């Protein structure tokens, strides 16, 4: 009986995973776009939509002490983050403002988002959560057999693009990669309407649309990690400038139309990061060997510690890369109620079964926060913690009025 139950579960999952995905030609894909122009999305728009569509709301600052915490600023909370991150509302709001501007093709779409802050402030966890969001997105349409899963509309000749854009109601950006251009000419006689198009989902493990670049020392750094390599076994068969020798398996190739993450980005030699300049400002990356530049559409996320950032920006020779970076500072949680939720989340996911005495978590949270804030000339540390938590501080029967912004500016915690 148990075997039948397991088999039923397996078959149910398999039927879901084998949901029919589109396979057709460019002509059929054009019909789909005509019915729904939102099918065509750039990377920032796709990522912003999948997070925003999970639900969001504007916090009522008159409730629950939010007016004290946020000083009357309008704050939006996003359902996608609310069960994972606590006390990071301001940081997440800045992240989503960046994403929205980039989705609308603002200057942010040509910049690198850098999460910078102390160890344990949630930089890596936030980046991982954003990457997981992309795996929830609808499968993307792309050229069948293309190593960088590029947008099928790249097949449209530039001379015809204004006419197609008017009919379809979308903007066509980008050019064919060298491999697909070679296939179009040699396999399809230039008849781009017959080029096959398919759908596939985003997957970090499958290296489809999500790439991660770990920090490397000077001896092991190789630009091929970013832009791919030439297949040496094919150099005996084809000339060096033949697209068929290309193996486009670098991070910018894998992360095209998705996300490229740089882990501890400034632990790398600065020369290794020069590809970022063309990837952001020109939306192109070099191809291996002697081929043309390759169009790149992707969200570049990176993170580092504060000391590494200070060392990087202190070097005047790094100005070019510095100008392409949007810095988002992550900080430790300074709100008592949110710190308690963090501890409760950790305990809930652990295997600890020991009884915890009443108020233990609250006292531990108070200790953590008071160890993070600095002494102020306006109040003691305990009072400061209460103000950061949005509480009214009553002293000698009167409410003690201390501006939270004055406390923040005093030491810039």
What are these regions (language model features)?
Residues 1-58, 117-120:
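N-terminal accessory segments that target, anchor, or regulate ATP-driven/P-loop NTPase machines
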Residues 37-413:
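Conserved ASCE/P-loop NTPase catalytic core
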């Amino acid at each position: 009986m148990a075997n039948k139950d397991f088999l039923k579960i397996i078959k149910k999952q398999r039927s879901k995973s084998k949901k029919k995905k589109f396979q057709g030609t460019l002509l059929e894909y054009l019909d789909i776009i005509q019915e729904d122009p939102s099918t065509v999305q750039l990377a920032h728009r796709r990522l912003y939509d999948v997070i925003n569509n999970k639900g969001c709301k504007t916090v009522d600052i008159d409730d629950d002490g939010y007016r004290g915490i946020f000083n009357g600023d309008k704050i939006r909370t996003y359902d996608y983050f609310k069960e994972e991150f606590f006390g990071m509302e301001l940081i997440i709001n800045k992240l989503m403002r960046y994403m929205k501007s980039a989705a609308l093709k603002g200057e942010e779409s040509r910049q690198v988002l850098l999460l910078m802050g102390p160890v344990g402030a949630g930089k890596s966890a936030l980046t991982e959560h954003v990457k997981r969001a992309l795996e929830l997105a609808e499968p993307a349409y792309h050229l069948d057999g293309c190593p960088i899963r590029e947008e099928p509309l790249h097949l449209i000749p530039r001379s015809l693009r204004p006419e197609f854009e008017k009919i379809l109601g979308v903007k066509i950006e980008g050019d064919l990669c060298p491999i697909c251009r070679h296939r179009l000419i040699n396999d399809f006689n230039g008849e781009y309407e017959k080029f096959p198009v398919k759908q596939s989902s985003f997957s970090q493990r499958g290296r489809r649309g999500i790439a991660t670049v770990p920090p490397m020392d000077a001896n092991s750094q190789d630009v091929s990690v970013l832009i791919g390599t030439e297949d040496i076994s094919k150099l005996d068969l084809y000339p060096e400038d033949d697209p068929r020798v290309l193996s486009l398996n670098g991070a910018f190739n894998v992360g095209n139309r998705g996300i490229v993450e740089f882990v501890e980005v400034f632990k790398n030699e600065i020369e290794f990061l020069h590809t970022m300049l063309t990837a952001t400002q020109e939306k192109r990356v070099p191809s291996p060997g002697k081929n043309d530049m390759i169009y790149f559409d992707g969200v570049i996320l990176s993170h580092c510690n504060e000391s590494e950032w200070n060392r990087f920006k202190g070097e005047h020779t790094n100005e070019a890369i510095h100008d392409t970076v949007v810095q988002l500072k992550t900080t430790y949680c300074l709100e008592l109620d949110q710190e308690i939720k963090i501890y409760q989340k950790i305990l809930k996911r652990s295997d600890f079964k020991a009884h915890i005495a009443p108020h233990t978590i609250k006292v531990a949270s108070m200790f953590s926060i008071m160890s993070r804030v600095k002494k102020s000339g306006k109040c003691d540390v305990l009072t400061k913690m209460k103000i950061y938590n949005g509480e009214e501080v009553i002293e000698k029967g009167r409410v003690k009025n201390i501006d939270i912004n004055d406390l923040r500016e005093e030491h810039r915690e």
